[in-house]
């Protein structure tokens, strides 16, 4: 986290949010997945989230880098399936909860298990993977109010197989619009994720047409050197779609 802050300062960013992943492999009362008879182990390796260590390191970074606004955060995976577990964990972050809460989808139910998106490309045609993904993403948006920002809208696009030909957003316009309509209706925000292939200005136009009023920028870094990566290009795309800087340099970009 210290190195990420160093990179943020070097990149000229006014602030950074550390949105660590929050994924679950067990469930409790109130978690929908408990009634679905699904194997939830969608990744070969998952590590415990050290909330105490995270918060202590966050405080240390704030002391070291007073010129940065350093926000707490979390990225909840499949929040619609683990509503109770996710809510209980978020509450441990202290009064008011994390500054930023992202919602994301990395895996979908398939043949009795929660299956990671990249595995699905080995089991069905690429277009079917995307349609299955968007259908589950819509269930996430409609089925969870825990998050503020929807992360990496078309996550499996990162793994789109070359053999399937170029990825065309227009081929999935109906699916994109369904998700964007639901997200806008809930008055939440869309992330422009610079680790994924950048959303086009046209797709961000669909977000505007759905009633979306704001976007956030996320480098989805995972490594310090990626903090702020491609933000200048992302700004160009977002501006082309009509969004502008918000009330101050820390705000979301808005219409």
Predicted regions and their residues:
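An N-terminally biased module of ancient metal coordination in phosphate/nucleic-acid-related enzymes
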Residues: 1-80, 158-170, 178, 222-229, ...
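Hydrophobic faces of well-ordered beta-strands that scaffold small-molecule active sites
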Residues: 16-18, 70-74, 101-103, 149-151, ...
């Amino acid at each position: 986290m210290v190195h990420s802050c160093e990179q943020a300062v070097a990149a000229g960013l006014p602030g950074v949010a550390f949105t660590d992943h929050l994924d679950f492999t067990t469930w409790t009362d109130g978690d929908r997945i408990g009634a679905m008879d699904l194997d939830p182990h969608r990744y070969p390796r998952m590590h415990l989230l050290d909330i105490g260590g995270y918060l202590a390191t966050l405080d240390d970074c704030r002391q070291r880098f007073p010129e940065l606004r350093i926000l707490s955060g979390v990225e909840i995976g499949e929040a619609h399936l683990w509503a109770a577990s996710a809510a209980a964990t978020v509450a441990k972050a202290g009064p008011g909860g994390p500054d930023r809460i992202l919602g994301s989808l990395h895996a979908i139910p398939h043949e009795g298990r929660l299956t990671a998106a990249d595995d699905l490309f080995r089991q069905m045609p690429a277009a079917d993977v995307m349609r299955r993904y968007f259908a589950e993403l819509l269930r996430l948006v409609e089925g969870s109010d825990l998050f503020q920002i929807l992360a990496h809208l078309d996550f499996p696009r990162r793994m789109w197989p070359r053999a399937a030909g170029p990825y065309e957003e227009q081929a999935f316009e109906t699916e994109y619009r369904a998700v964007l309509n639901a997200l806008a209706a809930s008055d939440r925000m869309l992330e422009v994720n610079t680790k994924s292939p950048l959303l086009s200005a046209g797709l961000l136009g669909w977000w505007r047409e759905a009633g979306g009023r704001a976007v956030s920028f996320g480098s989805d870094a995972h490594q310090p050197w990626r903090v702020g990566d491609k933000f200048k290009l992302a700004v160009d795309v977002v501006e082309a779609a009509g969004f502008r800087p918000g009330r101050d340099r820390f705000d979301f970009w808005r219409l």
